[in-house]
Amino acid sequence: DVAPSRGLGDVYKRQDIETPIGGTLLGALQSGGIFLSSACGGGGKCGQCRAQVIDGGGEILPTEKGFFSRKQVKDHWRLACQCKVKEDMVVQVPDEVFGVKEWECEVISNKNVATFIKEFIVALPKGEHMDFIPGSYAQIKIPTYSMDYNKDIDKSLIGPEYLPAWEKFGLFGLKCKNDSPSIRAYSMANYPAEGDRIMLTVRIATPPFKPKPQVGFMDVMPGIASSYIFTLKPGDKVTMSGPYGDFHPIFDSKREMMWIGGGAGMAPLRAQIMHMTKTLKTTDRKMSYFYGARALNEVFYLEDFLEIEKEFPNFTFHLALDRPDPAADAAGVKYTAGFVHQVIHDTYLKDHEAPEDIEYYMCGPGPMSKAVENMLDNLGVPREMLHFDDFGG
């Protein structure tokens, strides 16, 4: 018996699910069309698949306790992927879960937009629609497979601009195998006005390099989700679900907004910025976007932001490139050399009257996020003004 967290009295959303004994609560809920977030695919690592087990379910496991406060444990919160169905159960799930749907989608595009990043676009089935707030993420089912990068990745979809780097680093010598079906979460780069589709920016997760002076990759498998996505071609079918997450803009505030991104962390930030400008036509808030990349050929959606900058005087786009880039100079693209956290500080925040009054929205690689966090902390920005996304970087 499943009900929303706002109370068991809300009968209108109660649902009975019959399931065989022995499986996980996560699997049982999925079989009943209730899709809890599960970024790690049910491995007990992400702590996302939370539900309140009001009756049944037994004692909480040691593997779950680290994800909950003592009060939450007392209130019967569990990780659905760790909780086995051994008897009749009464379960409460977060209200928004009832808005999540799963579809078989068709791939409509899967091209590289940077050396190691794909723009992956799928169409929802005809007549289907997803209501979501920009900054949400989707989940993709990863089936069992065995693949060879050289045979199974379409080189024409990587493109001539990026192929030399793939060959130089030996990526086409990699192989990947997935022995059990899994799920992965990726932030959506699209915003609602772009129609009934899901657009992700996916970075290939290669094995670490061997320590110098050795060359090549360590004998470790590449990422099973990104490897799978990089093999997909237009016309292929994939199972997706969404929307999930709460990395959303605060719409009813008039505070200044700053987005900070790097790498594939572009996705949810693009969605939010496009929605705030193109859809909501926001002109009464100061807005800026600082994006960090190694070089100009690793920057994508640049035209989107330059166009918004022209159309909205309250929006500015700032590009930070790791080092001086002759290609950017030749193209006349404005940028500042340096890491993004330093560029934000030196070119903007150090002379800002009140950095603590800005809302910060951040998504990108771990080291970037940590450096930005430390810089903002040193400026006295309270933690609650920072909004993070975990599924884009």
Question: Model-predicted segments: where are they?
Answer:
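Local cysteine-cluster metal-coordination motifs and their immediate loop/turn environment
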Residues: F35-P62, R70-E87, M362, G366-P367
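Single conserved hydrophobic/aromatic residue that forms the stacking wall/gate
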Residues: D1-Y12
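Generic structural signal for buried aliphatic residues
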Residues: L25, A138, V238-M240
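FNR/FR-type flavoprotein reductase catalytic core
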Residues: T206-G393
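Ferredoxin-reductase
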Residues: E106-P234, A293-R294, A320-P324
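Short, contiguous acidic and Ser/Thr-rich linear segments
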Residues: R14-G23
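Short, surface-exposed secondary-structure boundary micro-motifs
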Residues: A51-G57, P94-E96, P143, R203, ...
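Fe-S ferredoxin-like electron-transfer domains
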Residues: G66-E128
